[in-house]
Amino acid sequence: MVCNTNILKDVSTKISAFENVRMIMVEGEMFQVARIHKQLKNRVSAHSSVGATDVVYMTSILEYLTTEVLQLAENTSKDLKVKRITPRHLQLAIRGDEELDTLIKGTIIGGSVIPHIH
C-alpha cells in the first residue's frame, strides 16, 4: 500500500490544531466555550457559520474584557476602602478608562452619574 506523506502531515497538522484548540477550551476558562458557541449559532444568520476557533477567540476576548473591568472596579473599591464591588464602582472604573468608556456606552443601573465639573 502506497501512502502519501503529505496527506499524513496535513492530517497530523489538523489533529494537532484541534488539540491546541481543545487545550485552550479546557485551561482555566471563565466562560464556557460550548455555551458561547451555542449563543453565537443562535444569533448568526442562517447563511453563515461559526467555527470552533472563532468561538475560542470570542471567548478569550470576553474573558479579557471582563477581567479588565473587574480589576479596575476592584481598584476603585479599594480606593474607597470598601470590600464589595458595587455598580457604582463599575461605573467609575469604566468611565475612568478612556478606551473602555468608548467601548461601553450603555447605562449601568445603579451606577449613578459621573460628576462633570466645568
Curated annotation (Swiss-Prot):
Pfam families: Histone. Keywords: Chromosome, DNA-binding, Nucleosome core, Nucleus. It comes from the Eukaryota. Not ubiquitinated. One of its GO terms (cellular component) is nucleus. GO terms for molecular function: DNA binding; protein heterodimerization activity; structural constituent of chromatin. The keyword DNA-binding applies. InterPro entries: Histone-fold, Histone_H2A, Histone_H2A/H2B/H3. The nucleosome is a histone octamer containing two molecules each of H2A, H2B, H3 and H4 assembled in one H3-H4 heterotetramer and two H2A-H2B heterodimers. The octamer wraps approximately 147 bp of DNA. Belongs to the histone H2A family. PANTHER family: HISTONE H2A. This is Histone H2A.8. It comes from Arabidopsis thaliana (Mouse-ear cress). The lineage of its organism: Eukaryota, Viridiplantae, Streptophyta, Embryophyta, Tracheophyta.
